[in-house]
UniProtKB/Swiss-Prot annotation:
Superkingdom of the organism of origin: Bacteria
Location(s), subcellular: Cytoplasm; Secreted; Cell surface
One term of GO molecular function: magnesium ion binding
Protein name from the UniProt record: Enolase
Cofactor(s) this protein cannot do without: Mg(2+)
Chief localization: cytoplasm
InterPro entries on file: Enolase, Enolase-like_C_sf, Enolase-like_N, Enolase_C, Enolase_CS, Enolase_N
Keyword Cell membrane found: no
Free-text comment on the cofactor: Binds a second Mg(2+) ion via substrate during catalysis.
Role summary: Catalyzes the reversible conversion of 2-phosphoglycerate (2-PG) into phosphoenolpyruvate (PEP). It is essential for the degradation of carbohydrates via glycolysis.
Gene Ontology CC entries for this record: cell surface; extracellular region; phosphopyruvate hydratase complex
Catalytic activity as recorded in UniProt: (2R)-2-phosphoglycerate = phosphoenolpyruvate + H2O
Length: 431
């Protein structure tokens, strides 16, 4: 096997994401004629500690959301540094990209520029070897297909409705394969649409393909999902569990949690009580961002009360950053990390965060963003690292479905080697 292949060109362009905002797409060309491509996602609710996504700010073009500066940074500064490098030396290339930027948040060149290049390099290397990306990144032991954490009711920043919490999801832990898991979720999704219609609710979709009805309360979102699970022929708490992304930083104001649509203002301790009541009442297996990104004491209390029963996922809390993750591990905040490639900005740093989480006994959930493209890198990544869980929206809208279809292909390619761990994917809890 050739272990040295030069990069001969790097080309970036501005494309559109699923929310009709510009994003960066990068192509890396190799001396043997191989090309690798990657497109960068973008978030709606973003953590304050995320790597910086460079936007042009020109209000006359795409409402200031253009990314031509990031594109130019790739085509000029980054391309000049990358041409002649060995495509198979991913750690070196990622280190060089970080040093080329020179800031601690990738604010000079832009995390969207840097990530696009990092992922395009990995794709080019895999293509040159004739390997699937998951095999190139994960090696021969890459074999675990993920339990989907499927967002089927959208609220918060992902929808214009009366639901405070951002995402209500289903997890088909009772399936025996990813193929079966996807079918189960699709059946519940269609049943939920009919259930909402029967109740007189609108069935318009949010950013991630979930329904965005004007429900009477946050709890009604869970009630109607459980009803749909039952009507679809499955058992809530056995075949399927509920997962929640509270995105609580979005309604954390002056040290309090303001649930406007319920007319409640809660302290950290009261917010923990709120979730504990839900966990005792409903078949909830995972809560993401239950507390705000700055409320470390609240996170610690939440973990003390619920950490043995429920997966507690840090998204805004950790932003895929090893420094923040290390602090969380030290003080006992959360027991899981959400992994978003564009929060940190390179493939190598992402893999480092996953490794640190696993060493500490944390699960890692590989995630999309609300602004997505047809890029399927995260589908390969979740199998490459045997994470066992993926969060990539509803089984609707092609930018979400593309990820699920890629996982079907991977499961087919792995054949008998493929593993679907179901409830065993939650090795961090005893429920």
């Amino acid at each position: 096997m050739n272990d040295y292949l030069e990069i001969i060109d790097v080309v970036a362009r501005q494309i559109l994401d699923s929310r009709c905002f510009p994003t960066v797409e990068v192509e890396v060309y190799l001396e043997d004629g191989t090309m690798g491509r990657a497109a960068v996602p973008s978030g709606a609710s973003t953590g304050m500690y995320e790597a910086v996504e460079l936007r042009d700010g020109d209000k006359d073009k795409y409402l200031g959301k253009g990314v031509l500066t990031a594109v130019q940074n790739v085509n000029d500064t980054i391309a000049e540094a990358l041409i002649g490098c060995n495509v198979f030396d991913q750690p070196y290339i990622d280190k060089m990209l970080i040093e080329l930027d020179g800031t601690n948040n990738k604010g000079k060149l832009g995390a969207n520029a840097i990530l696009g290049v990092s992922l395009a390099v990995a794709n080019a290397a895999a293509n040159a070897l004739g390997l699937s990306l998951y095999k190139y990144v994960g090696g021969v032991n890459a074999k675990v297909l993920p339990v989907p954490m499927m967002n089927i009711i959208n609220g918060g920043s992902h929808a214009d409705n009366s639901v405070d919490l951002q995402e209500f999801m289903i997890m088909p832990v009772g399936a025996t394969s990813f193929t079966e898991a996807l079918r189960m979720c699709a059946e519940v999704y269609h049943t939920l649409k009919n259930t909402l219609k029967d109740k007189g609710y609108a069935t318009g979709l949010g950013d991630e393909g979930g329904f965005a009805p004007n429900l009477k309360s946050n709890a009604e979102a869970i009630d109607v999902i459980i009803e749909a699970i039952t009507k679809a022929g499955y058992k809530a708490g056995e075949d399927m569990f509920i997962a929640i992304d509270a995105a609580s930083s979005e309604y954390y104001k002056d040290g309090k949690y303001v649930l406007e649509n319920e007319g409640k203002t809660l302290t950290s301790a009261e917010m923990v009580d709120f979730f504990e009541d839900w966990v005792n009442k409903y078949p909830i297996i995972s809560i993401e961002d239950g507390m705000a990104e700055e409320d470390w004491d609240g996170w610690k209390l939440l973990n003390e009360r619920l950490g043995k029963k429920v997966q507690l996922v840090g998204d805004d809390l950790f932003v895929t950053n090893t420094e923040r993750l290390e602090k969380g591990i030290e003080i006992g905040a959360a027991n899981s990390i959400l992994i978003k490639l564009n929060q940190i900005g390179t493939l190598t740093e992402t893999l480092n965060a996953i490794e640190m989480a696993n060493r500490a006994g944390y699960t890692a959930v590989i995630s999309h963003r609300s602004g997505e493209t047809e890029d399927t890198t995260i589908s390969d990544l979740v199998v490459a690292v045997n994470a066992g869980q993926i969060k990539t929206g509803a089984p609707a809208r092609s930018e979400r479905v593309a990820k699920y279809n890629q996982l079907l292909r991977i499961e087919e390619e792995l054949e008998d080697v493929a593993e679907y761990r179901g409830k065993k994917a939650f090795f961090n809890i005893k429920k």
